[in-house]
Regions:
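Short, cysteine/histidine-rich loop/knuckle motifs that typically chelate Zn2+
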Residues: 107-110, 119-126
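General detector of N-terminal leader/presequence modules that precede the first folded domain
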Residues: 1-45, 160
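Short, contiguous alpha-helical
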Residues: 2, 6, 31, 60-103, ...
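Short microdomains enriched in Cys/His and/or Lys/Arg
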Residues: 125-161
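Acidic/histidine-rich alpha-helical segments that form the ligand environment
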Residues: 47-88, 105-108, 155-156, 160-162, ...
């Protein structure tokens, strides 16, 4: 797909325009097709660009794009937030919610606001409640409580099937293109679950807990305080999962909407935290599947 053509760009804009017009006319089933096509085009182009670029200075790219947004007069506030995010990353820390507030975009005209929308759209007059909130990722609202519990129960079964029959050597072998081994992925799942376990305890014992940011992905290759084998890491993960499921199933449904203050993401509910971790795990299953295929081919 050649995205460097006027036709590609014009088609993308036309799809968004068509979707907006169809929504105004109440033809939502057709509008969803136009929006899906636009999203597919954008994601496909980004997927190709990431692979073509290879190693890239992410901090510098953020700064470059912030400058481009200023030139296009998109949003000075957003450009400034991107610069603050780049500065935090350059210092080796996670940007806070104060530095990178949640963005809201008017669904009618595209006007962008950082932080809660308290007034009508400055461009088209749309009501505050009609703005689209851009969450840090889709995991927050992916699963409602019963679906999240079902997924938390299912994922260890899928992981067990993926690692079945593999030796410790195979599970400790790095990916051919570099990156994590199966051992690292399972360690990451175990570590992330540990964060969920701890935060669930905070929600159970405190009215409005403060949730510290955790760079969990940086722990996956550390070997200190790890069980000696990948299978033992998995068994530890599976045992803790059973305990978490028991506690979640005992919670009154209303308690899922209790909120805490996350240092990175701001106000979050227990429902969003459980959805986050349950959906996050799914993104690693294809990674384990690919590593399994690599191990089987190497036999």
């Amino acid at each position: 797909m050649d995205t460097q053509t006027p036709e590609w760009t014009a088609t993308l804009v036309r799809l968004f325009a068509l979707a907006s017009r169809l929504e105004e006319e109440g033809h939502y089933n057709v509008a969803k097709l136009a929006r899906a096509a636009a999203d597919s085009m954008g994601r496909g182009a980004a997927y190709a660009a990431v692979r073509a670029a290879g190693e890239q200075d992410t901090v510098q790219e953020i700064r470059n794009l912030a400058g481009s947004l200023r030139q296009l007069d998109v949003s000075e506030g957003l450009a400034a937030a991107l610069q603050r995010g780049a500065t935090a990353l350059a210092k080796g820390r996670i940007p806070s919610i104060g530095e990178t507030p949640h963005p809201y975009v008017c669904r009618t005209c595209g006007h962008l606001v950082l932080g809660p929308v308290d007034d009508h759209c400055a461009t088209c007059g749309a009501w505050p409640g009609t703005f689209q909130w851009f969450a840090p990722n889709w995991w927050f609202d992916a699963l409602e409580p019963f679906a999240a519990i079902a997924q938390l129960r299912q994922t260890p079964l899928e992981v067990a099937a993926l690692i079945s029959g593999l030796s410790e050597q195979a599970m400790a072998h790095d990916a051919q293109e570099g990156g994590w081994a199966i051992r690292n992925v399972l360690t990451h799942l175990r570590d992330a679950q540990g964060v969920l376990d701890f935060r669930l305890g905070l929600f159970e014992s405190e009215e409005h807990p403060v949730l510290a940011s955790k760079a969990v992905w940086t722990w996956a290759t550390r070997e200190e305080e790890r069980p000696p084998t990948t299978q033992e890491i998995f068994e530890d993960y599976r045992t803790t999962r059973r305990d978490i499921l028991t506690r979640l199933e005992a919670l009154p449904l209303a308690n899922w909407w209790r909120t805490g203050l996350h240092e990175e993401f701001g106000e979050v509910s227990l429902r969003q935290q459980v959805s986050y971790f349950a959906a996050h795990e799914l993104t690693h299953l294809s990674q384990v599947a690919g590593l399994r295929e690599q191990a089987v081919r190497s036999r």
